[in-house]
Amino acid sequence: MNAPGWGRRGLVAAATLGAWAGWQAARVKRARRRTDRTDRFRHVPDDPRHCVVVAGDSTAVGVGAGNPRLSVAGRLALALRDARIVNVAHSGARLADVPHQLRRVFGLIDASLCVVLCGANDVLRFTSPARVRRNVRALIGLAQRADVPLVLVPPGHIGAAPLWLPPLSWLLSWRARGVRRALFGAAHKQSGVEVVDLVLPARKDPFRAAPAAHYAADGLHPNANGYGQWFEQLVQQSRAVQHRLPPARRAPRVQLAHRLFR
């Protein structure tokens, strides 16, 4: 026979869980209302000398930037003034969707570089690590067959985004580590492939030091400052991007550290 105290504790626990779920659901609903409808940045200069393809999810679109020119694609156009920027990303994409995005353009244009920002939706939708590895290998194979250098930019600390409440934030942080580990493993030592690591030590991570200054109003996507930080990491870590920059714009290249277990 159950003691009366256990029944009361169960009711309190159920009420607490219900309140937490309602609060988190309300935050997600509010975030969806606040998510801007940024258009994909595309650019064709007067005399393009090479073509950069940008693909992936809403972060490749530039959701949260406010101005498409302040997205990663927009900043690439500013830095690579003689480059045509072709953006085929769409919000909600997972890694499995990226090859479909690229097949539409690789057969039509002569791309000199492909930058893929993707993986967040694989974290949020619980794509298994095995499937992440398969999807990344398919993406890499497509780029290699097209002879296009590939730069992969997986997400940073998704669980640390202000949108999420504990313990969901902890779960998403754990999930993000698994997805990143699978992605890095699939890309390891692949010819023509670089991976940019957006996960920085806590003391050096501006997203954790000053979240209000780097996250958009939805509490999930970067804002213009946040995309600026991502772009700086892209420039510092990617040899393929640095090679295409004017000499004055090149930064000291950072040796990529596999900080997967922190």
Q: What is each of the regions a protein language model found here?
A:
Residues 51-53, 59-134:
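Conserved SGNH/GDSL esterase-like catalytic core that processes O-acyl groups on lipids
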Residues 146-149:
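A short helix->loop->beta-strand "cap" motif at the edges of active sites that frequently abuts
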Residues 1-53, 235, 241-262:
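N-terminal secretory targeting modules
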Residues 161-197:
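Substrate-gating cap/lid alpha-helix
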Residues 223:
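Short, conserved phosphate/pyrophosphate- and ester-handling motifs at nucleotide-, phospho-/glycolipid
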Residues 117, 153-154:
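Alpha/beta-hydrolase-fold catalytic nucleophile elbow
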Residues 156-159, 201:
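Short "lid" loop at the C-terminus of a central beta-strand within the Rossmann-like core
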Residues 87-89, 154, 197-199:
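Residue-level recognition of beta-strand->loop/alpha-helix junctions
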